[in-house]
From Swiss-Prot:
Phosphoserine modification, residue list: S29
Subunit relationships: Component of the large ribosomal subunit.
Protein's UniProt keywords contain Phosphoprotein: yes
Compartments where located: Cytoplasm
Similarity comment: Belongs to the universal ribosomal protein uL29 family.
Modification N6-acetyllysine, positions: K19, K43
Main localization category: cytoplasm
The name this protein goes by in its record: Large ribosomal subunit protein uL29
Species this protein is from: Sus scrofa
GO molecular function (one): structural constituent of ribosome
CC terms in the record's Gene Ontology section: cytoplasmic side of rough endoplasmic reticulum membrane; cytosolic large ribosomal subunit; large ribosomal subunit
Keywords from the named record: Acetylation, Cytoplasm, Isopeptide bond, Phosphoprotein, Ribonucleoprotein, Ribosomal protein, Ubl conjugation
Gene field: RPL35
Length: 123
């Protein structure tokens, strides 16, 4: 089997990807048997290509799965931890923009009663 390109895999359905993954795994096991029995050098060099192809297929499957989960949870109140933005612990606990801008009744009253003074400069 020739080297598989990730862009070709992205258009395929999940069932097709799983079938291709199964085929690659079977091929890899055959190549490993050939390695033990003393197969040709061309087969031995093919092991690396097949392993990388398996990794590509699995990567595409995982990426599409995660993308679908992101779409599903978009706009929902709670998201799984692995879909939330990875920030530092302190940043996650920080007040959000709305909470930072909230003012107490006393503070609002004080600002209303004593607004900032505007001074005119005499030229």
């Amino acid at each position: 089997m020739a080297k598989i390109k990730a862009r070709d895999l992205r258009g395929k359905k999940k069932e097709e990807l799983l079938k291709q993954l199964e085929d690659l795994k079977v091929e890899l096991s055959q190549l490993r048997v050939a390695k033990v029995t003393g197969g040709a050098a061309s087969k031995l060099s093919k092991i690396r290509v097949v392993r990388k192809s398996i990794a590509r297929v699995l990567t595409v499957i995982n990426q599409t799965q995660k993308e679908n989960l992101r779409k599903f949870y978009k706009g929902k109140k709670y998201k799984p931890l692995d879909l939330r933005p990875k920030k530092t612990r302190a940043m996650r606990r920080r007040l959000n923009k709305h909470e930072e801008n909230l003012k107490t009744k006393k503070q609002q009253r004080k600002e209303r009663l004593y607004p900032l003074r505007k001074f005119a400069v005499k030229a």
